[in-house]
Amino acid sequence: MSIEQDILNLLAVKNIISSDELNCKSTDIHGVLLSLSSKKVVDYTIIPIVERVLTPQGRQVEKEGSQEYNLITMLMKSNLSIDNIDKTTLKYAFKNKWIKMENNQIVLSGTTIQDITQKLLRNLDSISKDEFEELKKRKLVDINKKNIYKITRGENFNIEQKDIINELTTQNLFNISDTSLLKKYNFNLSKVSRFFGSLHPLTKIKSEFKRIFLEMGFSEMNTGKYVESSFWNFDSLFQPQNHPSREIQDTFFLKVPRLNDLNDVDSQYINRVESIHSSTSIPVDEGYDKCYSKGHNNVWSVAEAKKNILRTHTTAISSQMLYKLAQSNLKAEIKNYNIKLFSIDKVFRNETVDATHLAEFHQVEGLISGENLGIKELIHTIKTFFTKLNIHQIRFKPAFNPYTEPSMEIFGYHPQLKKWIELGNSGIFRPEMLLPMGFPKNVVVIAWGLSLERPAMIKLGLKNIRDLVGHKISVEFIRDSPVIFMNK
């Protein structure tokens, strides 16, 4: 007789039955009950049970007595050498104070002897938790987990089950007399998960940043070059050659090719950059507004400017775009310095990796060039940008940057870390940077740069940047990430 029929027969005479009454495995019962309950023939509840059971070794001790008790029996007949006795047996015999050592011989101590271990095993259900754990350490007992099913009649209960019609066909469509035999639709079934390729959360956020920039009227810069000369990355930005960030502790220098020939840089522009950096007197070309800055008052080396590096910021691209803008206006009859540019790409810093820093990360950068721009317009633009990202808690802190003055650090509040974390830097590009390029004095360029990863951490509620980027993140994290991030 089948398990299904056994259940139906028992329920015909009893209102409720237990799976213990069925002489079969719970795994077999579970499948039958799922089938019957889907037809509403039976209802059932699962009661998890934890049992204390004897191991094979425990059953032997229950039957024949513990090793320490049997040791005492042997000692009653003759003395034994300590070398011939199991250490575990000795341990428990000494613990019970049944034996003692005399002249390297084990002898009885004279105390009353009772096989406590055997007694505990025979009363397994009533012993304390500590006593059970002690027996478990000796591998005499174990825990057995199982499910007990309490089964009752369902609304469609019938001892004689008719076959359910699972599908309609041209043969049975017009010949079904009892529609109750049609299998009901189950709208509560969990969906079948289908796994497709998923975009990394940073890729999605990058697309949203790009959309926001485009909405604000910005054009995207081409940032395909990871390797830059030190000239464009540092010198064109009026960053002194003895600045700490230009040392190997902060910057990745290339071994091959080690130097850049600077063929993409006009020699006269190199001279103007050298003049603004150096204390030496170098003639400035006619037609360029002269910068009266004292510079850095140090000797500028073109050899240092030729060193190839992995770019430390995308501002290296910004400086090239601004130089092209200035040069094109020098040749144009109608001047137009109004431009809004942005970039989102990787940069590299030789930093110690920790919860909020990586050696490789994405930099988001925006700049606006035009007349009558100042710190007020910069703050307004940054706040507008972050409002579109739905990050409203923004602070500014005065800072120093070699190529911007005034400069400000941008901080955003992290709800999970419950503290303000640095998002990026901002400022107004110095005349020492712009005038050698060919900009007139009345043109101002405001700019800001920030990490892509930091806002992503805030929106995803992550405390460690390595949970967002790296080999340890799970596929499920990527698959389950929201389609749109910045709308909440």
From Swiss-Prot:
Superkingdom, natural source: Eukaryota
Cofactor: Mg(2+)
A matching Pfam family: tRNA-synt_2d
Catalytic activity as recorded in UniProt: tRNA(Phe) + L-phenylalanine + ATP = L-phenylalanyl-tRNA(Phe) + AMP + diphosphate + H(+)
GO-annotated biological processes: phenylalanyl-tRNA aminoacylation
Keyword match Endoplasmic reticulum: no
Chain residues that bind L-phenylalanine: T315, Q363, V364, E365, Y403, F429
Disulfide bonds, paired cysteine numbers: none
Protein name: Probable phenylalanine--tRNA ligase alpha subunit
Native source species: Enterocytozoon bieneusi (strain H348)
Upper taxonomic lineage: Eukaryota, Fungi, Fungi incertae sedis, Microsporidia, Enterocytozoonidae
